[in-house]
Amino acid sequence: MKKYLFLCIAVVSLALSPGQAYAQRYLPKMMGVELRGGFVNGSKSPLNYYTGIAMSGYTKKANRWVVGAEYLLKNYDYRGTSIPRALFTAEGGYYLKFLSDPTKTFFLSIGGSALAGYETVNWGDKMLHDGSTLLAKDAFIYGGAITLELESYITDRIVLLANVRERVLWGGSLGKFSTQFGLGVKFIIN
């Protein structure tokens, strides 16, 4: 009988305790794998999109390093057809956490990244469908990006991501700036 009474008291006291326990998140040396994707320069055309994969590593002050790769496709209209511009880029960046809620469920970060990669226009084909010659050339590109990212922990190991990013890339034949709006998922692996 004493055993049941002790068990009932323990359950009631735990249920009524005002303290809450939260998961361990944003700890140093935690690593995560991100899968991301979204639209480029708004969602005017579903043909303008990006997708990528990245690895995140957290630091002592709840900031993180990000290393990854992205594929971006943007189509330009030309006389009733579209001319594709594809970018293959590698990223290395650092994100600063500047806002989080008390339950450590939502985190808002701002980050800067260095980008380098390759741009191809119309997949290297210079002749267009109407006989015109495309002057844009394939090229190596370099530049950077500024990102605002919201992380929402679904579980201790699964995180939903939402971000807005402005990229600037030099070396290519077409526009330097592109804005990205995207979503992603991150899996914490340790």
Predicted feature residues:
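Cleavable N-terminal export/targeting peptides
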Residues: 1-28, 190
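Short coil turns and loop connectors of transmembrane beta-barrels in diderm outer membranes
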Residues: 3, 25-29, 61-63, 100-106, ...
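Short glycine/proline- and aromatic-enriched beta-strand/turn motifs that initiate or cap beta-hairpins
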Residues: 21-74, 186-190
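Residues that define the transmembrane beta-barrel architecture of outer-membrane proteins
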Residues: 29-31, 45-51, 82-90, 106, ...
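Residue-level detection of beta-strand scaffold positions
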Residues: 34-36, 48-50, 56, 64-66, ...
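Extracellular loop and loop/strand-boundary signature of outer-membrane beta-barrel proteins
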Residues: 38-41, 76-83, 130-136, 168-172
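Gram-negative (and chloroplast) outer-membrane scaffold detector with strong preference
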Residues: 54-129, 187-190
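Predominantly the C-terminal beta-signal and adjacent terminal strand-loop region
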Residues: 72-74, 146-190
